[in-house]
């Protein structure tokens, strides 16, 4: 993978992770983070530039979907789940 492609993929990964953490619903947030990690790990060994570009284009479309869904989720937010209200253990 060319250096510019690698940088573009890493930037896209970071943007998707950052945006998915804005989901107000815990289940959506955790699902999005898990799905993004799994998808990028699954495709980390792809070497074909054409396939890489196709995956980058798909990820860009998915990022826009995440942004839209985050916005919609913020408009129609619900109460937090019990698991979200728990304090983190002190170490």
Swiss-Prot record:
Family: Belongs to the complex I LYR family.
Annotated binding of pantetheine 4'-phosphate, by residue: 6, 44
Protein name per Swiss-Prot or TrEMBL: LYR motif-containing protein 4
UniProt subunit comment: Homodimer. Component of the mitochondrial core iron-sulfur cluster (ISC) complex composed of NFS1, LYRM4, NDUFAB1, ISCU, FXN, and FDX2; this complex is a heterohexamer containing two copies of each monomer. Component of the cyteine desulfurase complex composed of NFS1, LYRM4 and NDUFAB1; this complex contributes to the stability and cysteine desulfurase activity of NFS1. Interacts with FXN; this interaction is nickel-dependent. Interacts with the cytoplasmic form of NFS1; the complex increases the stability of NFS1.
Role of this protein: Stabilizing factor, of the core iron-sulfur cluster (ISC) assembly complex, that regulates, in association with NDUFAB1, the stability and the cysteine desulfurase activity of NFS1 and participates in the [2Fe-2S] clusters assembly on the scaffolding protein ISCU. The core iron-sulfur cluster (ISC) assembly complex is involved in the de novo synthesis of a [2Fe-2S] cluster, the first step of the mitochondrial iron-sulfur protein biogenesis.
Signal peptide residue numbers: none
Localization (cell): Mitochondrion; Nucleus
Lineage of the species this protein comes from: Eukaryota, Metazoa, Chordata, Craniata, Vertebrata
Keywords: Mitochondrion, Nucleus
Modified-residue entries (N6-succinyllysine), positions: 47
GO biological processes: [2Fe-2S] cluster assembly; [4Fe-4S] cluster assembly; iron-sulfur cluster assembly
One example GO MF annotation: protein homodimerization activity
InterPro entries in UniProt: Complex1_LYR_dom, Complex1_LYR_LYRM4, ISC_assembly_LYR
GO cellular component, one term: mitochondrion
Pfam families in UniProt: Complex1_LYR
Main location, first listed in the record: mitochondrion
